[in-house]
Amino acid sequence: MRTFFLAYLAEGYGPVGRVDEGLAVLAEAMALVESTGVCIYEAELYRIKGELTLKRPEAGSNSEVQEEAETYFRQALNVARLQSAKSWELRATMSLARLLAQHGRRDEARAMLAEIYGWFTEGFDTADLKDAKVLLDELSA
């Protein structure tokens, strides 16, 4: 459970501009995954690392930082797929889709989000699926 709480503590630092602190907490969470072998949250850790990377001050104009974030999102996707963790896969896909759309790759973003969204047959009233639907509609407009 500690990894779970560290993940969301790290994520919480992003919106208040404390990115370095968030990344430090995330490093602690990733170290726990390594030391314990409990990797249930690993995909989400990579996704959060990508989100925090995009909040670094130099991220806006630095394509290397944005490529780094994309790499973390793709790592999150790979881990989620290996674990058959569809909820983590959805979250990682949404993060990646937003980044791709910002760089003119809307068709790619829409296609990958539509694929994972289409997998779900229930739970459409959950926050993640509602957010995915909104994003999918935006990408389709």
Task: List the model feature ranges, each with a label.
Residues 1-141:
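Helix-coil-helix junctions within alpha-helical repeat/solenoid scaffolds
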